[in-house]
Amino acid sequence: MKNDVISPEFDENGRPLRRIRSFVRRQGRLTKGQEHALENYWPVMGVEFSEAPVDFATLFGREAPVTLEIGFGMGASLVAMAKARPEQNFLGIEVHSPGVGACLASANEEGVENLRVMCHDAVEVLHKMIPDNSLSMVQLFFPDPWHKARHNKRRIVQVPFAELVLSKLKLGGVFHMATDWEAYAEHMLEVMSSIDGYKNLSESNDYVPRPESRPVTKFEQRGHRLGHGVWDLMFERVK
């Protein structure tokens, strides 16, 4: 697995030329299990970054709806979703190698075969590798809220990013976000509502109840016990 994660800067057209990162690169130390998974399962489930668009039918060995998850953490919920929906294909992107290793180990243990993972900046992957009109779902769960005002520009959900996601979704595809930071939820809602081509799937035109398809993470469970809220947003591509 190549170790060349970068996060380029957006230019005025939303292209990835930036040096402002939406993540802090915390590689951490690999456990023996994570290192074993990277060495043994990456050749099967890992996808190296490429300048060329990916062919999903070739990548997965079949034609099936593709869900892309950005920032899957340790991969527990992503593996659970892939296992629960074997008729679909899942591609996960995570910039921290311990999380990638943990996800690979879990997928192997659970016998999940419809999952592929990448260790690279998601913005560049979207621009370079994901074909337009190819995704059935894009998932972004609990991204860094960058809660200090001077850091708000680092939030991944900005108009250029949301427009980029829109271009990669099929007509009828859905962009599903979740955050436990209310101010970020409001920011997400403002950004998404400003873009022509998305339809808010909330009946109240704001947030949706957590769908059963999104597993509750340990982090989220701990937040519930502390009285923290969680906000889910789902927007469909309609044009």
Swiss-Prot record:
Keyword annotations of the record: Methyltransferase, S-adenosyl-L-methionine, Transferase, tRNA processing
Active site: 144
Role: Catalyzes the formation of N(7)-methylguanine at position 46 (m7G46) in tRNA.
Binding residue positions for substrate: 148, 180, 217-220
Assigned GO CC terms: tRNA methyltransferase complex
Keyword Transferase: yes
Pfam families: Methyltransf_4 (PF02390)
Region (Interaction with RNA) location: 150-155
Family: Belongs to the class I-like SAM-binding methyltransferase superfamily. TrmB family.
Record field: catalytic activity: guanosine(46) in tRNA + S-adenosyl-L-methionine = N(7)-methylguanosine(46) in tRNA + S-adenosyl-L-homocysteine
Subunit structure, interactors included: Monomer.
Binding residues for S-adenosyl-L-methionine: 69, 94, 121, 144
PANTHER family assigned: 3-DEOXY-D-MANNO-OCTULOSONIC-ACID TRANSFERASE/TRNA GUANINE-N 7 - -METHYLTRANSFERASE (PTHR23417), PENTACOTRIPEPTIDE-REPEAT REGION OF PRORP DOMAIN-CONTAINING PROTEIN (PTHR23417:SF14)
GO MF annotation terms: tRNA (guanine(46)-N7)-methyltransferase activity
Domain of life: Bacteria
Protein name: tRNA (guanine-N(7)-)-methyltransferase
Record InterPro entries: SAM-dependent_MTases_sf, tRNA_(Gua-N-7)_MeTrfase_Trmb, tRNA_methyltr_TrmB_bact
Database matches in Gene3D superfamilies: Vaccinia Virus protein VP39
PROSITE patterns: SAM_MT_TRMB (PS51625)
